[in-house]
């Protein structure tokens, strides 16, 4: 111990006290240390030899334990973006961090170091390794990746001839442009629903849609917020043909 790492003074009961500085104590790693205090009478340095009597000394065992600190896991809640979550935490420990994840409700054995990217609720487990100064830390938490909202453009509608029904043919000429909000590269497509006019009668009719849905391996990562906006289509009159007429002779009766 260097001279600058301790102070000598009187204790509360009037006895001599040796106080180690905080800078010295914090420099020690966890473990046991033996401190020997030697006393030089009258401030004279002891010189061995002759009839000189060695000064008294005191031995003290100093035990330094590891500090117990916490770790705060930052929120990982987000809307689906096709990218794995990026975990982070605040802690005083300088130990190596290990992150593990599993679906919420799954057994502890399901933990894996692969960071999730798909929509769902997950459990996270952070382990901070023990160091010379700090105890091992283990923290858990929960976060949710929310499905991304997506909407469908209004499909093209075909006019038709009156047939007594409200059904209208609809289609997307460019299926890749049918959706707004899809992330490039995701496997996502539209399941076509039904289009129906507000009346089966002839005229320009308002058409609404039902039954449209999403398909593909990434469909669970999206939330279809509504059916396509309404459109319009024309129902035209159905041509009616009259067959041949038969004319019969008759006696005069004054009528046409």
Residue spans of the language-model regions?
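Short loop/turn motifs that initiate or flank beta-strands
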Residues: 1-256
């Amino acid at each position: 111990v260097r001279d600058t790492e301790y102070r000598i003074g009187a204790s509360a009961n009037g006895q001599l006290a040796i106080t180690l500085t905080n800078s010295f104590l914090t420099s020690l790693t966890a473990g046991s240390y033996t401190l020997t205090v030697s006393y030089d009478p009258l401030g004279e340095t002891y010189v061995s030899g002759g009839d000189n009597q060695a000064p008294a000394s005191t031995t003290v065992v100093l035990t330094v334990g590891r500090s117990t600190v916490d770790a705060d896991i930052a929120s990982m809640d987000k809307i689906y973006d096709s990218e794995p979550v990026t975990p982070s935490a605040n802690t005083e420990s300088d130990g190596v961090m290990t992150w593990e994840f599993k679906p919420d409700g799954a057994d502890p054995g399901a933990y894996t170091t692969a960071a999730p990217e798909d929509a769902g609720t997950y459990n996270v487990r952070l382990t901070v390794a023990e160091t010379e100064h700090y105890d091992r830390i283990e923290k858990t938490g929960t976060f949710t990746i929310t499905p991304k909202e997506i909407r469908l453009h209004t499909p093209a509608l075909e006019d038709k001839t009156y047939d007594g029904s409200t059904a209208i043919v609809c289609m997307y000429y460019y299926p890749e442009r049918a959706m707004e909000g899809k992330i490039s590269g995701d496997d996502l497509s539209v399941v076509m629903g039904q289009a129906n006019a507000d009346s089966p009668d002839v005229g320009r009719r308002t058409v609404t849609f039902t039954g449209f849905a999403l398909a593909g391996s990434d469909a669970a990562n999206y939330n279809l917020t509504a059916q396509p906006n309404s459109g319009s289509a024309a129902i035209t009159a159905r041509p009616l043909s009259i067959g041949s007429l038969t004319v019969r002779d008759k006696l005069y009766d004054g009528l046409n």
